[in-house]
């Protein structure tokens, strides 16, 4: 659609202008582009971004499915989704002691693998499924996020010069909510495409 295309082009132009202005500010820049020359920092930021896309991007649609399709009350929906939150808290608490015995890179890889496995389990969910089918996916998404996300900020800050630690922390923090927003958008586009293919136009 024309309006979507122009909005995208306008956003891309604004982003390009922002990066150009930041590059001109040098050490006074809000976003130090030089940080992206550090491979480990880039990897930590991208993992933060991807982790939030796949761990949290589905949550709004799961909420809509539980409430709109299965007609669960807000309280019951919240209790079901609490499984992911509690698992994430427990996994995050365990990830600290584990990092003393296992390489952080191994923990990050294991966490992302668990998230991927959880997403794979989502293929078992149908319109007729009940919440027990959803539970393994929520537990795995929570466990994977809990293992990875606590270490990514430390990793991003530890590999940059000390004077740029604040900028590195701010940049990495920016990619957390950005990943969630992009994840919601991506899964929303996917849902819309599936609905347009599966339902007749009058139903839409």
Ranges and model annotations:
Residues 21-27:
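Membrane-interface capping segments at transmembrane-helix boundaries
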Residues 2-10, 14, 28-199:
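12-transmembrane solute porter fold
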Residues 16-19:
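Alpha-helical transmembrane segments
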Residues 202-204:
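Transmembrane-helix exit segments and adjacent C-terminal regions of multi-pass membrane proteins
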């Amino acid at each position: 659609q024309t309006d979507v295309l122009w909005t995208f082009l306008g956003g891309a132009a604004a982003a390009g202008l922002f990066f150009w202005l930041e590059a001109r500010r040098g050490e006074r820049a809000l976003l130090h582009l030089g940080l992206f020359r550090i491979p480990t920092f880039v990897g930590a930021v991208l993992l933060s971004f991807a982790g939030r896309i796949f761990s949290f991007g589905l949550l709004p649609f799961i909420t809509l499915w539980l409430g709109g399709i299965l007609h669960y009350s807000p309280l019951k929906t919240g209790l079901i989704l609490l499984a992911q939150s509690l698992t994430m808290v427990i996994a995050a608490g365990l990830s600290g002691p584990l990092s003393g015995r296992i390489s952080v890179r191994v923990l990050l890889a294991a966490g992302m693998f668990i998230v991927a496995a959880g997403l794979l389990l989502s293929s078992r969910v149908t319109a007729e499924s009940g919440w027990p089918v959803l539970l393994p996916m929520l537990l795995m998404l929570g466990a994977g996020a809990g293992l990875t996300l606590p270490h990514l900020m430390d990793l991003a800050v530890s590999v940059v010069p000390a004077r740029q630690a604040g900028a590195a922390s701010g940049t990495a923090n920016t990619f957390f909510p950005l990943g969630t927003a992009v994840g919601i958008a991506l899964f929303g586009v996917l849902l819309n495409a599936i609905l347009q293919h599966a339902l007749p136009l009058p139903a839409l």
